[in-house]
UniProtKB/Swiss-Prot annotation:
Native source organism of the sequence: Conus textile (Cloth-of-gold cone)
Protein name: Conotoxin TxMEKL-021
Keywords attached to this entry: Disulfide bond, Knottin, Neurotoxin, Secreted, Signal, Toxin
First-listed, main subcellular location of the protein, grouped into a coarse class: secreted
Disulfide bonds: 51-65, 58-69, 64-75
Length: 79
């Protein structure tokens, strides 16, 4: 069973290294290679402008880069 697991791991590594050069040689932007993270970090959301910065007005925590909408009035660093 251990040999099978090691064999599968080696096969996955070999397949992943072969898949990288088959991209056609073009350089892809970094944001297109996000296969490990599903959520954007607060800094990424702020850079893209999809969230409001600290002390900006808000009505919901999802609007704030920090994730904290204090008393449904403004974005705070912490509660």
């Amino acid at each position: 069973m251990e040999k099978l697991t090691i064999l599968l791991l080696v096969a996955v590594v070999l397949m992943s290294t072969q898949a990288l050069p088959q991209g056609g040689g073009e350089k892809r932007p970094r944001e297109n290679i996000r296969f490990l993270s599903k959520r954007k970090s607060n800094a990424e959301r702020w850079r893209e402008g999809s969230c409001t910065s600290w002390l900006a007005t808000c009505t919901d925590a999802s609007q704030c880069c920090t994730g904290v909408c204090y008393k449904r009035a403004y974005c705070a660093l912490w509660e």
